[in-house]
Swiss-Prot record:
Stated name of the protein: Carbamoyl phosphate synthase arginine-specific small chain
Compartments where located: Mitochondrion matrix
Family (UniProt): Belongs to the CarA family.
Taxonomic lineage: Eukaryota, Fungi, Dikarya, Ascomycota, Pezizomycotina
Alphabetized SMART domains for the sequence: CPSase_sm_chain
Entry function: Small subunit of the arginine-specific carbamoyl phosphate synthase (CPSase). CPSase catalyzes the formation of carbamoyl phosphate from the ammonia moiety of glutamine, carbonate, and phosphate donated by ATP, the first step of the arginine biosynthetic pathway. The small subunit (glutamine amidotransferase) binds and cleaves glutamine to supply the large subunit with the substrate ammonia.
Database matches in SUPFAM superfamilies: Carbamoyl phosphate synthetase, small subunit N-terminal domain, Class I glutamine amidotransferase-like
HAMAP family in the record: CPSase_S_chain (MF_01209)
Organism: Aspergillus niger (strain ATCC MYA-4892 / CBS 513.88 / FGSC A1513)
Reactions this protein catalyses: hydrogencarbonate + L-glutamine + 2 ATP + H2O = carbamoyl phosphate + L-glutamate + 2 ADP + phosphate + 2 H(+)
Length: 453
């Protein structure tokens, strides 16, 4: 059999020549873009080691919080996840970029098929080795070309094992990527802490938008703290039309027009979102509407109920983290991306832990004892990652439809009450969200935040 296969193979010389021509063409395109393929770059951890490598992204400098992910695949989804806003993402997988970067194609709902937001969200990218040549039927450009086009610096050729070991032992640290210049150890002001910036304000839609289901069974209000596209898809594909609101929208004032409320993921310190916490508290005081929160949404829901959140030493960022369902005893492999967690010991008496992380015993979810309200720290929509817990969307939407039917039974004219939101006139995608910003703009944003305080 193998003899027949090898005999049928074409001569290699023309193919090799074609590959060489392709490589040369890409190299020349890179040079024409003004991004030298082997320009020196430096990754510096504040009060820590310095690593020298090569730039393969934008020719700019950036600072942020250095965090790491152990995910093997899904780098386009990770890098466009708004939860990574302001962070320099270190990949433990040795080779990144071998299947390229897909297009910004949208599905039948108008949602991005391959990205979690329209722009690259991470402040910087750190890899051991980057694939200059890619191969995948959805790919339209290389990882380096994408980073350069999005204005995000990236560095390869560094010892990511040593970086991750340092971050694991010392905790997530401020770091800096510089391209084409030496780092001055005295420039302490070059390190900007994104945790001091209200990052949710940067990634949340600036005005409501609406996405209709093909066969709508209910209408859900989504609080956008940096929502991932696949979360929206997970709701819409199950028959929920959604109206997405800015993070600080007074949702309790319009909740009676909806069958459920969902609180999304997002970046940064949850205590920055005091407006959201207040509106959620008022929502639970004035409405019995079902509520589901994911990631940052889980933390905000906990804060609204009087619990506290804590910052983890280095966070949980991977696609293979085990979480125990305390109600069934079943273990799920989950996708996670968070640097904060809910302190389960501070949950009020009418709440109980729903999921527990089997690696570090941190809280991964909570559920109300008598009301249809629950939340998870992990991402049941995955993308990338396993779909073990995607059934949670079904549980949530079952409670939403049940609530809707109950409301109609007692208020048969509920659907004819005029709504202040004319959904047909709303935008169909997030409004006014800006691409990730460079180090200088981050510093300016931090200074503005301090001045405003």
């Amino acid at each position: 059999m193998f003899a027949r296969v090898f005999k049928a193979m074409p001569a290699r010389a023309p193919a090799f020549t074609s590959v060489n021509a392709s490589i040369q063409s890409r190299f020349m395109a890179t040079v024409r873009q003004g991004r030298p393929a082997t320009e020196r770059a430096t990754f510096t951890i504040r009060d820590g080691p310095i690593f020298h490598g090569k730039s393969f992204g934008a020719r700019s400098n950036i600072s942020g919080e250095a965090v790491f992910t152990t995910s093997l695949v899904g780098y386009p989804e990770s890098l466009t996840d708004p939860s990574y806003r302001g962070q320099i993402l270190v990949f433990t997988q040795p080779l990144i970029g071998n299947y390229g970067v897909p297009s910004a194609e949208r599905d039948q709902h108008g949602l991005l098929k391959y990205f979690e937001s329209p722009n690259l969200q991470a402040a910087g990218v750190v890899v051991a080795d980057v694939a200059e040549q890619y191969s995948h039927w959805t790919a339209v450009e290389s990882l380096g070309e994408w980073c350069a086009r999005e204005g995000v610096p990236a560095i390869s050729g560094v010892d990511t094992r040593a970086i991750v070991t340092y971050l694991r032992e010392q905790g997530s640290s401020l770091a800096r990527i510089t391209v084409g210049e030496e780092y001055d150890a005295d420039q302490d002001e070059a390190f900007v802490d994104p945790e001091q910036i209200h990052l949710v304000r940067q990634v949340s839609t600036k005005a409501p938008f609406h996405v209709s289901a093909a066969d709508p069974q209910c209408h859900v209000a989504v609080i956008d703290c940096g929502v991932k596209e696949n979360i929206l898809r997970s709701l819409v594909s199950r028959g929920a039309s959604i109206t997405v609101f800015p993070f600080d929208y007074p949702i309790h004032k319009v909740a009676h027009h909806f069958d459920g409320v969902f609180i999304s993921n997002g970046p940064g310190d949850p205590t920055h979102c005091q407006d959201t916490v207040y509106h959620l508290r008022r929502l639970m005081e004035t409405s019995q509407v079902p509520i589901f929160g994911i990631c940052l949404g889980h933390q905000l829901l906990a804060l609204a109920n009087g619990a506290r959140t804590i910052k983890l030493k280095y966070g949980n960022r991977a696609h293979n983290i085990p979480a125990l369902d305390t109600t069934t005893g079943r273990c799920h492999i989950t996708s996670q991306n968070h640097g904060y967690a809910v302190d389960a010991s501070t949950l009020p008496s009418d709440w109980k832990p729903y999921f527990v992380n089997l690696n570090d015993s941190s809280n991964e979810g909570m559920i109300h004892k008598t009301r249809p309200i629950f939340s998870t720290q992990f991402h049941p929509e995955a993308k990338g990652g396993p779909l073990d817990s995607s059934y949670l969307f079904d549980i949530y939407l079952d409670s939403v439809v049940k609530y809707k039917n109950h409301q109609l039974a007692f208020h048969p004219n509920r659907n004819t009450v005029p709504s202040p939101l004319l959904v047909d006139l709303l935008a169909k995608e997030r409004v006014g969200v800006q691409p990730t910003i460079g180090m200088q703009n981050v510093a300016a944003a931090a200074a503005a935040a301090v001045a405003a305080a």
